[in-house]
Amino acid sequence: MPEAGSTNLNDISMTPKQYAYYSLNDVKQYKCLVFLYGKESAWNPKAINGSHAGIPQGRSKWLITATPIHQVEWGLRYIKHRYDTPCKARDHWLLHKWH
């Protein structure tokens, strides 16, 4: 986890799940994201399904070469833009099996 006073997340060693938890700072939203990415990619940064790639299974070729942390950052921005929260994205996934 981050050291006290650290501000640059690129200098911190953490797993994608730890990074997501740190970024969201909300247990409920984190649990929704864990469910969502568990279904989409099993948190596998090398997962590819058709034109979708990475942990968030985004439709961006950039995700194929992005680090796992950058994939999570990308996914969180996508969720914020499209659904507002990971729980709303999860609810959409439960209805449609995609997000």
Residue ranges, per PLM feature:
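Membrane-proximal envelope biogenesis segments
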Residues: 1-8
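Peptidoglycan cell-wall recognition and remodeling modules
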Residues: 8-99
